[in-house]
Amino acid sequence: MSFINKANYFMKGMKEKPIYVYTKEEETKYENYIKDSIGEFDKVYHELYSPDIHVDILIIPPTETQNYYKLVTMGMGAYKMNVPDIIKDQGYDRAELVMYLPPDWNLKFKTEEDGWVIRQLKLIARTAIEENSWVGFGHTFSGDAEATIPFANNTKLSSTILLYALDKEYEQLHFHLPNKDRINFYQVFPLYKEELEYKQKYGTEALMRLFDDKDIIPIVNINRKNYCENIELDKNNDEIEEDLER
């Protein structure tokens, strides 16, 4: 079972605050699972300051068959999320994140254009513990309340949605801690403002049906087509899908 290190965080004028981290055994098993299911990582983006959970990001380089970077969080799943009572016993209370980047992405993450992906991963990873809530399939996140401000100057993408992440065999990714608790992996997929609005009205599955196959592949494409740019949201979903098929 993940332990709480109560002696790791102090700030002047504040009460002691627990940090949720994997044990050494859990961390080793997790790393081995990533190597077997997603790929060998050759870099780790280490978190220098951890007020609540310790979230490192494993970086898996492109290969001949999968020509893109894979970013995988490590540490988010040490915290057991406060899921709704209706799914309390269904194994949705632990999660980790995956994000895929094109092979020419600058991994120094020093500029807005390159670094927003790290900020999104960190933001989502801490949402559950900061808000005493949970994250899961179909949940959306943005950099501002209205999702109107793009992540960077070179894109109009302004929010993200969580989809189920798949392993090398295209099966849904799950990892089990030694205590048998399941950790679900979610793909962080960027959206445009109009796509977020469509999802909020019609749901995740309806939004995904609009995408071409080439854009469903979840590699971040900062210039991809906006699938909801010219859609009238006052129509019902069946009318919209009929219009798109014409």
Predicted regions and their residues:
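Acidic, proline/glycine-rich low-complexity IDRs
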Residues: M1-V72, M76-N82, K88-Y92, V98-R246
